[in-house]
Amino acid sequence: MDLKQYVTIVPDYPKEGVQFKDITTLMDKGDVYRYATDQIVEYAKEKQIDLVVGPEARGFIIGCPVAYALGVGFAPVRKEGKLPREVIKVDYGLEYGKDVLTIHKDAIKPGQRVLITDDLLATGGTIEATIKLVEELGGVVAGIAFLIELSYLDGRNKLEDYDILTLMKY
């Protein structure tokens, strides 16, 4: 199935010059959303995943149905101040400054095989920070899965030590 036909390109959003890839027009078609999820599930089965981890918010949209299909748990990575219990955190760079990502300190057990999911691989900064959180807790990043990769932003270069699945490339 050609998933690109279900992604809407929104010009000049959120700012001029950006061609935003809107996945809601993929998700609102149950058979297409299921197909995309199933592709990631098949990839994850080969990796013997114990836990799925995804950064907010679209990492949840991808990761939760994958975790459900695999029969494993899901651990959210959130911005600072959004998780209620003790967390670990990591600072990461954005094009306009810095931000902080957190995960519950007890979310991952040492040695657990983790699949990281997100909707889009752009510069790789968010996923690089997510990897640091997973590894700090002793998790093993067994794979990383994205719906979309923006190849021209070279985010994959930051993640060259990891196995990556992308369902669409632009």
Curated annotation (Swiss-Prot):
The keyword Signal does not apply. It catalyses: AMP + diphosphate = 5-phospho-alpha-D-ribose 1-diphosphate + adenine. It is found in: Cytoplasm. GO terms for cellular component: cytoplasm. It comes from the Bacteria. GO terms for molecular function: adenine phosphoribosyltransferase activity. The keyword Transferase applies. Gene3D superfamilies: 3.40.50.2020. Pathway: Purine metabolism; AMP biosynthesis via salvage pathway; AMP from adenine: step 1/1. It is an enzyme of class 2 (transferase). Its EC number is 2.4.2.7. Keywords: Cytoplasm, Glycosyltransferase, Purine salvage, Transferase. It holds the Pfam family Pribosyltran. GO terms for biological process: adenine salvage; AMP salvage; purine ribonucleoside salvage. Its main location: cytoplasm. InterPro entries: Ade_phspho_trans, PRibTrfase_dom, PRTase-like, UPRTase/APRTase. Homodimer. Belongs to the purine/pyrimidine phosphoribosyltransferase family. PANTHER family: ADENINE PHOSPHORIBOSYLTRANSFERASE (PTHR32315:SF3). Catalyzes a salvage reaction resulting in the formation of AMP, that is energically less costly than de novo synthesis. This is Adenine phosphoribosyltransferase. It comes from Bacillus subtilis (strain 168).
